Amino acid sequence: IGDIWSGIQG
């Protein structure tokens, strides 16, 4: 996804 939780590429 690339949100706060998963960082950039999560």
Curated annotation (Swiss-Prot):
GO terms for cellular component: extracellular region. Disulfide bonds: none annotated. Expressed by the venom gland. Keywords: Secreted. It is found in: Secreted. Transmembrane segments: none annotated. This is Venom peptide 3.
